[in-house]
Regions:
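Bacterial Sec-dependent N-terminal signal peptides
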Residues: 1-21
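Outer-membrane beta-barrel biogenesis signature
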Residues: 17-44, 201-220, 233
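Short, charged, low-hydrophobicity "junction" segments
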Residues: 18-23, 165-170, 242-243
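Short, surface-exposed charged micro-motifs
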Residues: 23, 102, 257
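Outer membrane beta-barrel
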Residues: 29-179, 183-200, 219-222
Length: 276
């Protein structure tokens, strides 16, 4: 008996392309695209920060150290349909969690409405991006008193008084439980912040990065106050901290900060108070 054996072959044609040359310079994102009709843009970037700690104990002359990845982030932003509808996202590669996922709508003049998860309008140091810090990390005040990130809605407005004086106001209603919390909440967090800039805007949004990299030619100052009321908070610090076992509590937080820059000199200071 004769048997016929069929052996199928799959032929795949692969095309080789030369390496593309991009016009995007270093520091302007891995992906930086814009549609021909200007209906959308997107910019995606990646960054990481490593850290080394060394500790010497004089009591027993012992030394210990460690090296690790402090942060690794993928972040992007752009607009869709119109420059008045912007979006921002940020993903923490190191810890595997979404940090920011927010839509920003400029619905009228100097009015903006934000919806999603992002940083709360709290102390200035927390709103500094980690890539724009002057020191290796944020302060202990920020660790224990920050409002951090939360999911909700924010209303923002800016008002010019005279030629230079600028007033920015920010209101937020959020779930009050912090980053990536999906549990049902019995209360919300209500936040208000006002920022006074008597000498006008900082160069290139310099009020929200630490050192005076742009070397302000004229003095620039921002004075700010924040109030937050967290109703029926389930965590010790509101948006941060350990869960409160079997109970909730109301938290009131006051924060004040000042930021000054002039010709390479920079200063910022913060005050925070929290009561139950």
């Amino acid at each position: 008996m004769k048997k016929l054996l069929f052996i199928p072959f799959l032929f795949v044609c692969l095309a080789a392309f030369a390496q593309d040359i991009t016009n995007t310079p270093f520091g302007k994102g891995i992906i930086n695209l814009k549609s021909k009709d200007n209906s959308w843009t997107t910019k995606v970037a990646f960054r990481f920060q490593t850290r080394y700690d060394g500790e010497f104990d004089f009591s027993d002359s012992s030394f210990s150290d460690r090296a690790y990845v402090r942060r690794a982030r993928i972040k992007g932003h752009g607009y869709a349909f119109s420059p008045k509808v912007q979006y921002k996202f940020e993903y923490d590669v190191h810890n595997g969690q979404v940090l920011d996922a927010v839509i920003k709508w400029n619905f009228a003049g100097n009015w903006n409405l934000w919806f999603g998860q992002t940083k709360m309008p709290g102390n200035i140091e927390r709103v500094f991006s980690s890539q724009k810090l002057q020191l290796v990390d944020r302060s202990l005040l920020n660790k224990y008193f920050t409002l951090d990130r939360d999911a909700g809605v924010q209303l923002r407005h800016k008002l010019n008084l005279g030629e230079t004086f600028l007033v920015r106001s920010k209101l937020a209603i959020s779930q009050g439980e912090g980053l990536n919390r999906k549990a049902w909440s019995s209360g919300n967090s209500y936040t208000g912040r006002i920022e006074l800039l008597p000498f006008g805007n900082f160069t290139k949004k310099g009020d929200y990065f630490a050192s005076d990299l742009k070397r302000e030619e004229t003095p620039k100052l921002m004075l700010s106050v924040t109030y937050d009321y967290n109703d029926n908070a389930t965590r010790q610090g509101g948006q941060m901290g350990n869960d409160i076992a079997g109970s909730t509590r109301d938290l009131q937080s006051w924060q004040a900060d000042a930021h000054f820059k002039y010709r390479g000199l920079s200063f910022f200071g913060e005050y925070a108070n929290r009561v139950t």
